[in-house]
Amino acid sequence: MTSYDPTLFEGAAAHYRYGRPPYSPQLEAALAEELGLDGSGRLLDGGCGPGILTIRLAHLFEEAVGLDPDAAMLAEGRRVAAERGISNIRWVQAVAEDLPEAAPGPYRLATFGQSLHWTDEERVVETVYDMLERGGALALIVHTVEGRPEPPSPGPPRIPHAEIKALVEKYLGSTRRAGQGVSQVRTHRFEDVLVRTRFGAPRSIFVPGIPDLVRDSESVLSGYFSMSSSAPHLYGERVEDFAGEVRELLAARSPEGLFWDWPGDTEVVLAVRS
């Protein structure tokens, strides 16, 4: 496997599914309609983590492949898939730069759910182009609030992200960390990458997010522990001190322990192989 920092998401796998806001419940139907998915062909989910997308989309294909370099993330994906009786997923431990050898095509759809930025983007996109069937698609899936109407609050207060981030900085410093290094700030859009490849200019579809998503305090804390920049191992022996301060803050902001989370709509950036 190409070089990978195994501490990048160390300790995060158990928090990921519980702590990350879900994509639109209409995502599967939207992809099926846009791409004519009918249960045939194969799916490649790159940087799949614990299989959030892999598991949701597997029923739309004959076979799904979840690819990720983190063994704990893949183990979590296997566990959940087994619990749900999903048997058509193959899990591959590799980075996207190991494609195509790590998981040879062809594929009808390749997805990256908020994960392409961890890769050598242009190189990986060009590789994926060759792995797709003719007419196959690459879908980059993200939450977005940009230009999207905000729904009315369902009642509970918003998650106090600014205050929690201040606590993260108190414990970890002002430099945003990631594994053994620092997190790189992304300054470009996916469209900027795709237009330089054989895919050309992509198009975006927007699928309605969950307007009344309410999360409890432990889910909010797990959301931070699921991030590379705030993974449990970064806090060392002070991890419980950090967790305690976050819980105190959340209890002060919402005695009921409930918070409104609006991650936005689900944006799918689609590019099709000609």
PLM features: residue spans?
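A short beta-strand submotif of the Rossmann-like class I SAM-dependent methyltransferase core
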Residues: 109-112, 121
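Conserved Class I S-adenosyl-L-methionine
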Residues: 185-274
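Conserved class I S-adenosyl-L-methionine
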Residues: 1-38
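A short acidic, Gly/Pro-enriched loop at the edge of an enzyme's catalytic core
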Residues: 101-109
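A short, conserved alpha-helix within the catalytic core of class I
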Residues: 118-128
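Class I SAM-dependent methyltransferase SAM/SAH-binding core
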Residues: 42, 50-98
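Conserved catalytic/acceptor-binding region of the Class I
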Residues: 129-211
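Conserved beta-strand/loop positions that form the S-adenosyl-L-methionine
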Residues: 46
